[in-house]
Amino acid sequence: MNIDIRIEDNSAEVLKELDNKMPELLSSMGNEVCKHIQNFMTEDKIVDTGRLRGSISYSTPYIDYNIPTLANTANDFIKNNKEKNTVVYGSNVEYASYVELGTSKQRARNYVKTGTYRAIPQIKKVVETILKGE
């Protein structure tokens, strides 16, 4: 009795398909994390004029995503990320880090950190759905 075992290397095809899906994956991850950050900011009342919440944006090597509001300027948004396979998200508003990390007179609000943690389960689901081709 002969047993014939054949192993095929399909890694090149898998990597090519992953590379093809990368723009959609990164954009979906950016959408989810920004949505969760903005939702947390609303829940925790981290809104005064709306400029900071409106500036939450992301950038991938394929797209810069933002939704400008009347309170925002063009420089408020994250843009021009050229690093392969990454999503850069947050805000370029000059006081964003003070609200996130706090100051000697203001407690840290951790809106980026909390929103990111809240987004992780949904990001996993979205990525799985995209990779399965559903």
PLM region spans:
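Short, Lys/Arg-rich flexible segments
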Residues: 1-134
